[in-house]
């Protein structure tokens, strides 16, 4: 998000009355001319309806409406019950088909087909307009739409999972045991693009080993990539990226991966020092230094993750802290999220709070790790003494209120996480890329942080008692936005691309069934019931049909 967007978000969070609220269309009060135009625009359809009724009443004699109604009534009275059975059965069949189609379309596209057609095609033909007074080309409107467009693009951006697993040592072992593929082609293609961005540059043609690795990162077949890495090592035994590929994809254990990453580190440091000495010679050498820096940071980070997985947590914390000090511009890699998880494992809560104080900032992008870790720290101070019965009788203390508000803030940012922390949904292996505020981010967070919530006594109990209150205390917090922007509508589609097909994707906000699904369901049920009653009790239904026709005739004659 832009800095201005975050300042607006903060102003909304503290209840500032002058904070800009994107998407709500707030502006200065309208003058009497604008209100008059709006009133006339809204009353136009009512006036046309009244004019039509008046015209129909005036032409009732020339059009011989009463005689026509009498003829229709006589025709209906002469119909047999079999006709009504056939009519209602046909209506029930048609409405049932419409209902099935509406239900399928809603589950596939998330909207009603009839409503979409009505709004997109029929409403413009009938003269319907948006209930907005400002002109489409006005500067305020264009600025607001541009801000919202940039916001939605940033919200739907896919990020690399900072805690992603190793393909050979973890993902492949899962496939061997279960026979299921935990990664989607879309996710792996994104990783291939990341590797080409991090590990290649325009001077690769100067070194044959880098040329081979450039082709290896584009290769889709894992055995072909591994074969290309060995070819690169034959050309240059100090090819760091070749060791990286082998550690990621060929190593079947974390110990083997760490050994290969240490070899990559030795080679990467040599290449990095050479690039530092030549960086000012030309723009190509500067690009080469950026590439070698990316390789070195990636290797050190993965070594820290290996140490974390092998139980050497303090060593992992030291590597991460050194990385953050040595390469502060690379904050977009979210190394602080790796550091937070390792510090939580050490139960160094004071250090966790210090990291949050730096990164839980209004000018920095939020994440589930940031929001839920902040909630966990506040929950930790009150969870062991929290009791729903006591809270109901005496109310919440100040510390408990702060903890509940932190949970509500975290749930508003990502509402999918609590079901995984409370084990209401089963976890799967996290993908290599996540969508902020989406189901993929929730899986990645809960996969690594569930143990930290379980370690603190009463934390999950407090979460279970309070997380759903986010949707009760604040009306539509996801749709309208409270502490954050409204929940993006693109998360479901992106998560379905990132997560495997055997996982049931969580969807928020909960979609309500459109009106036309209820309408067609009611129409189908009622016509089927009428057909059944007409078939079973033809005389009674005949009397009922005549009574309805007589009442209709009386109403028309009265008019």
From Swiss-Prot:
Transmembrane as UniProt keyword: yes
Keywords from the named record: Membrane, Transmembrane, Transmembrane helix
Source species, domain of life: Eukaryota
Subcellular location: Membrane
Family per record: Belongs to the ST7 family.
Transmembrane segments: 39-59, 83-103, 513-533
Biological process (GO), any one: negative regulation of cell growth
Protein's organism: Rattus norvegicus (Rat)
Classification of source organism: Eukaryota, Metazoa, Chordata, Craniata, Vertebrata
Its membrane topology: Multi-pass membrane protein
Pfam family, one: ST7
Principal location class: membrane
Name the UniProt record assigns to this protein: Suppressor of tumorigenicity 7 protein-like
Cellular component terms (Gene Ontology): membrane
């Amino acid at each position: 998000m832009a800095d201005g967007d975050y300042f607006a978000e903060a102003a909304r969070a503290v209840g500032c009355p002058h904070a800009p609220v994107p998407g709500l269309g707030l502006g200065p009060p309208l003058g009497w001319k604008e209100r008059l135009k709006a009133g006339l625009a809204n009353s136009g359809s009512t006036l046309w309806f009244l004019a039509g009724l008046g015209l129909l009443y005036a032409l009732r004699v020339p059009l011989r409406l009463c005689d026509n109604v009498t003829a229709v009534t006589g025709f209906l009275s002469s119909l047999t019950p079999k006709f009504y059975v056939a009519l209602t059965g046909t209506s029930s069949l048609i409405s049932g088909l419409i209902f099935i189609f509406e239900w399928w379309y809603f589950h596939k596209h998330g909207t009603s087909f009839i409503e979409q057609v009505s709004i997109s095609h029929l409403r413009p033909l009938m003269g319907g307009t948006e209930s907005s007074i400002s002109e489409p080309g006005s500067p305020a409107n264009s600025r607001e739409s541009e801000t919202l467009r940039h916001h939605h693009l940033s919200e739907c951006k896919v990020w690399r999972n900072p805690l992603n697993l190793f393909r050979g040592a973890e993902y492949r072992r899962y496939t061997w045991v279960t026979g299921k593929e935990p990664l989607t082609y879309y996710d792996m293609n994104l990783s291939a693009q990341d590797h080409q961005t991090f590990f290649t540059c325009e001077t690769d043609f100067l070194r044959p080993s880098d040329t081979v690795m450039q082709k290896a990162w584009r290769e889709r077949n894992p055995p072909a990539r591994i074969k290309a890495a060995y070819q690169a090592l034959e050309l240059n035994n100090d090819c760091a990226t070749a060791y990286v590929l082998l550690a990621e994809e060929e190593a079947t254990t974390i110990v083997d991966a760490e050994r290969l990453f240490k070899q990559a580190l030795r080679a990467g440091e040599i290449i990095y020092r050479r690039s530092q000495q030549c960086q000012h010679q030309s723009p190509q050498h500067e690009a080469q230094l950026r590439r070698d820096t990316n390789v070195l940071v990636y290797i050190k980070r993965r070594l820290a993750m290996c140490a974390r997985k092998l139980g050497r947590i303090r060593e992992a914390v030291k590597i991460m802290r050194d990385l953050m000090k040595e390469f502060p511009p690379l904050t977009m890699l979210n190394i602080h999220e790796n550091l937070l998880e390792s510090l939580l494992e050490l139960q160094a809560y004071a250090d966790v709070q210090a990291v949050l104080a730096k990164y839980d900032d209004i000018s920095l992008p939020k994440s589930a790790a940031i929001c839920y870790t902040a909630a966990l720290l506040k929950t930790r101070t009150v969870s062991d003494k929290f009791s729903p019965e006591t809270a109901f009788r005496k109310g919440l203390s100040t510390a408990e209120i702060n903890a509940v508000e932190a949970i509500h803030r975290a749930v508003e940012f990502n509402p999918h996480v609590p079901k995984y922390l409370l084990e209401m949904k089963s976890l799967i292996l996290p993908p290599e890329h996540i969508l902020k505020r989406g189901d993929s981010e929730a899986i990645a967070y809960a996969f690594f942080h569930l143990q930290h919530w379980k370690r603190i006594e009463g934390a999950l109990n407090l979460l279970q008692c309070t997380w759903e209150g986010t949707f009760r205390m604040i009306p539509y917090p996801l749709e309208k936005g409270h502490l954050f922007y409204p929940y993006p509508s693109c998360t479901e589609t992106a998560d379905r691309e990132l997560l495997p097909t055997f996982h049931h994707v969580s969807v928020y906000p909960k979609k309500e069934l459109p009106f036309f699904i209820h309408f067609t369901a009611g129409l189908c049920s009622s016509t089927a019931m009428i057909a059944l009653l007409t078939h079973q009790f033809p005389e009674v239904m005949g009397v009922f049909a005549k009574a309805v026709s007589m009442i209709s005739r009386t109403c028309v004659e009265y008019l």
